[in-house]
Amino acid sequence: MSIQRTLSIIKPDAVAKNVIGQIVARFEQAGLKVIAARLQQLSRADAERFYAVHKERPFFKDLVDFMVSGPVFVQVLEGENAIQVNRDLMGATDPKKAAPGTIRADFADSIDANAVHGSDAPETAAVEVAFFFPEINIHSR
């Protein structure tokens, strides 16, 4: 087992539903610690840079439009196997296919408005965490 860090974004749809606390509680109950967090409005340029890996995909414009439609809650989670634990808590990308009790099954409306984003691998986690949080703003506890 290894201590990992992962990026979690509570997306505009879940922020608008006022379920930030319920989602964070699930992370903490699963043994993950929030070691950096903030509520912010993404600029279009930031959303395009963050999701640049999807730039050539047909859904890119809709994804960027959605991510700038309201504030997001970005956080760094730390814990044993944090990346996989977070992905298990989130559930399948499509909430209709997400297991009961997962964040997306409980709080997401569609494959587009799917409540949360989480890093998918250690390499992407490192890049995504650094995108939002300089190391000086991250505090292990």
Curated annotation (Swiss-Prot):
It is found in: Cytoplasm. It comes from Bordetella avium (strain 197N). CDD domains: NDPk_I. The lineage of its organism: Bacteria, Pseudomonadati, Pseudomonadota, Betaproteobacteria, Burkholderiales. The active site is at H117 (pros-phosphohistidine intermediate). NCBIfam families: PRK00668.1 (NF001908). GO terms for molecular function: ATP binding; metal ion binding; nucleoside diphosphate kinase activity. Belongs to the NDK family. SMART domains: NDK. HAMAP family: NDP_kinase. This is Nucleoside diphosphate kinase. Keywords: ATP-binding, Cytoplasm, Kinase, Magnesium, Metal-binding, Nucleotide metabolism, Nucleotide-binding, Phosphoprotein, Transferase. InterPro entries: NDK-like_dom, NDK-like_dom_sf, Nucleoside_diP_kinase, Nucleoside_diP_kinase_AS.
